[in-house]
A protein has these predicted regions:
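A cross-family phosphate/adenosyl-ligand binding-site feature
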Residues: 5-64, 70-71
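Hydrophobic/aromatic beta-strand patches that form the interior of the parallel beta-sheet core
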Residues: 14-16, 49, 76, 109-111, ...
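Short glycine-rich anion-binding loops that position phosphate/pyrophosphate groups of nucleotides
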Residues: 54-55, 80-83, 154, 221
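Glycine/threonine-rich flexible loop motifs
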Residues: 83-92
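Hydrophobic/aromatic ligand-binding patch that stacks against planar heteroaromatic rings
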Residues: 97-101
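Short, glycine-/small-residue-rich phosphate/pyrophosphate-handling segment
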Residues: 109-135
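C-terminal accessory domains and tails appended to enzymatic cores
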Residues: 142, 146, 152-223
Length: 223
């Protein structure tokens, strides 16, 4: 909601959001069950829809059904609850939606706040998102540019600025906690830690975030 209110300062906004939490859905699409779409709110220049599918489903629903041939000036995905730096971009539903939107030829940005707390302050991060939105709209980009933007936790006066950088090399080292349900059957919870393979590199998103900068990573689809 915080970034929606910021975006409204620039013009008409259409929000298409998943009905349920979609963390880790990456670029998944719904193929073997129907999608449902409902109107949640209409208020001035704001229209909000809820979609039963994945973040990428929401983008496809927007471009191929709701927009009816229109191309938005900018696609915004997020603000995500938690970092999408380094290899996490490949697991991210937030970035899956941003990348999908760029396929349609319009600029897009995925926004994430490096805070998993239930009391995370999205209002502060929305202030920084406003500058990114303003800069991208002012640049009048006519290419499918996609940015992965991560905002570190902190008060506005603690953030040192924006840093254009590259994706850090690393991987998640997972563990599975095994427990038993009331019927004695095993079930598992996934957990793990991120292993940074280049902790001393100063040109990466992980370094930028650890040193109080907002990381801005241009994303390319051609891998």
């Amino acid at each position: 909601k915080a970034v929606t209110e910021v975006a409204l300062r620039f013009g008409r906004v259409v929000v298409i959001a998943p009905e349920t939490t979609q963390s880790g859905m990456a670029h998944a699409v719904t193929m073997y069950s129907p999608l449902y779409l409902r109107t949640v709110e209409k208020r001035g220049d704001l229209t909000v829809y809820a979609c039963s599918g994945t973040p990428v489903d929401c983008v496809k629903m927007g471009y191929d059904h709701i927009f009816a041939g229109e191309r938005p000036a900018l696609n915004i995905s997020g603000i995500n609850h938690g970092s999408n730096s380094a290899v996490s971009i490949l697991y991210s539903g937030t970035m899956g939606a941003a990348i999908e939107a760029s396929f349609y030829g319009a600029p897009s940005v995925g926004l994430s706040l490096t805070d998993h707390s239930p009391d995370a302050d999205f209002e502060a991060s929305a202030l920084f998102a406003e500058k990114i939105i303003s800069d991208m709209l002012t640049a009048n980009i006519n290419e499918p540019v996609c940015l992965n933007v991560n905002i570190p936790v902190g008060r506005p006066d603690q953030i040192r600025g924006y840093r254009v950088c590259r994706q850090n090399r690393g991987y998640w080292k997972e563990e599975f906690y095994c427990r038993k349900d009331p019927r004695g059957k095993d079930y598992f919870w996934l957990t793990g830690d991120f292993y940074n393979q280049e902790p001393d590199a100063t040109d990466t998103d992980e370094w930028a975030l650890a040193n109080g900068y907002i990381s801005v990573v241009p994303v390319q689809v051609d891998m």
